């Protein structure tokens, strides 16, 4: 029986490929019913971390627990098929020579025929696949194939679900729909889920918490709102969205900027070099004379629900993100203030 409160637990997990450290002392927990997004660029170690959790790579250092039980670490190495994990990958990996129903039933060899049929019907119904049960994978759309892969992974009632870039092959509108359906299914089942992705929007849309990974290490783990509003490092700030950056100096517990003074973190001594980073939405249009700075519009783009402007002042160029509206012409002068809620000051590298 699964221990109460236990889902997936990685403790000081490390892994080397030859002389290259791919995963470096990674630790995190995923509770039942929680979706943890493991977010980072290609080659950062996130897929290796998932494979270590699944048992697809032999653990070299650390410990992996599933449902409160050690499945890897020390002398323990439980094979993948006995770890009670479901997995969905980018290519779906459906069996082309058998039907949708048979694909969903693939992992149900240990249950009775009646239970097998019940689970096929349950997951086909939840994912809108009932009418497609007799069909074969080549007869399905990309979204339908993704739903079959998810149904097959969920039918054995896994303790942990592992998703490795599962939506990247879908077009954008369908991708959003399948993401939302997947979250609904995982929450309904109460399954601890690790989602590996390089897409910040996907991680923020689907995850309860996000672990941001770089060069084999976790840089920050927190809620989507918190990692966006209070990034722990410049890498986290840059990876989540576009940033504007200015070199500044700390003086009197603050930094001077073209927009006025902003508070510096208490740990940064006076005279130290610092980096000011702020998101495009930190630039907020104001009337002249209200503590605002004049900027010249270099370029303006309509991007649906918002406008992206490139503006300049004192030889420096910045990106601004404003609500949808008329586009100002190049050369127009606009006045902006800076919202400190979207500003971050870090020690200079």
Residue ranges and their predicted role:
Residues 63-83, 112:
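ABC ATPase NBD Q-loop/coupling interface
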Residues 15, 27-30:
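Conserved A-loop
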Residues 243, 253-349:
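Non-catalytic connector elements of ABC transporters
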């Amino acid at each position: 029986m699964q221990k109460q409160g236990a889902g997936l637990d990685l403790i000081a997990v490390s892994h080397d490929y030859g002389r290259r450290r791919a995963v470096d002392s990674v630790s995190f927990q995923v509770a039942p019913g929680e979706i943890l997004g493991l977010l980072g660029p290609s080659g950062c170690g996130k897929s290796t971390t998932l494979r270590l959790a699944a048992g697809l790579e032999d653990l070299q250092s650390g410990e992996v627990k599933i449902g409160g039980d050690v499945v890897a670490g020390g002398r323990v190495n439980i094979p993948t098929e006995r770890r009670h994990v479901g997995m969905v990958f980018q290519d779906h990996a459906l069996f082309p020579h058998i039907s949708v129903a048979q694909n969903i039933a693939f992992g149900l060899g240990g249950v009775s025929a009646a239970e097998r049929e019940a689970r096929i019907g349950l997951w086909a119904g939840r994912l809108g696949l009932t009418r497609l049960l007799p069909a074969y994978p080549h007869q399905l759309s990309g979204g339908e194939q993704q739903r079959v892969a998810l149904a097959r992974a969920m039918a054995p009632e896994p303790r942990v679900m592992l998703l490795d870039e599962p939506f990247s092959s879908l077009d954008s509108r369908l991708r959003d729909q399948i993401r939302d359906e997947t979250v609904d299914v995982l929450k309904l089942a109460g399954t601890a889920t690790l989602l590996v992705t390089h897409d910040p929007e996907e991680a923020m849309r689907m995850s309860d918490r996000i672990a941001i990974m770089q060069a084999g290490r976790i840089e920050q783990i927190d809620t989507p709102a918190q990692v966006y509003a209070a990034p722990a490092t410049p890498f986290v700030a840059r990876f989540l969205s576009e940033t504007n950056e200015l070199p500044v100096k700390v003086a009197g517990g603050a930094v001077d900027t073209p927009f006025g003074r902003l508070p510096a973190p208490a740990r940064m001594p006076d005279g130290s070099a610092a980096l000011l980073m702020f998101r495009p939405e930190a630039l907020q249009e104001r009337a002249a004379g209200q503590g605002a700075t004049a900027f010249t519009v270099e370029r303006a783009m309509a991007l649906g629900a918002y406008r992206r402007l490139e503006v300049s002042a004192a030889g420096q160029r910045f990106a601004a993100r404003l609500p949808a509206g008329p586009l100002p012409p190049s050369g127009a002068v606009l006045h902006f203030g800076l919202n400190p809620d979207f500003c971050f000051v870090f020690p200079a590298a």
